[in-house]
Amino acid sequence: MTLVMGCCCGRFCDAKNKNKKEDVEEGREGCYNYKNLNDLDESEARVEFGPLYMINEEKSDINTLDIKRRYRHTIESVYF
């Protein structure tokens, strides 16, 4: 299992998506920004709060996550 934190609005950032992080700052829709909490560097002192997802990596691909589908089998649990 992997513990992933993601923002709760927008869409996932990928090559197909036109809206990137800069769009959020300009008030547009933006994109998801998932962060694997297991991979945080000790030097990263600040982590923004967001919903936490328990993901079974054998059944899912983090890059395909969409908040609208958060109750499907790919996400084991959602913590707010």
Swiss-Prot record:
Keywords annotated in UniProt: Early protein
InterPro entries: Orthopox_F7
Induction info: Expressed in the early phase of the viral replicative cycle.
Family: Belongs to the orthopoxvirus OPG051 family.
Protein's UniProt name: Protein OPG051
Gene encoding the protein: OPG051
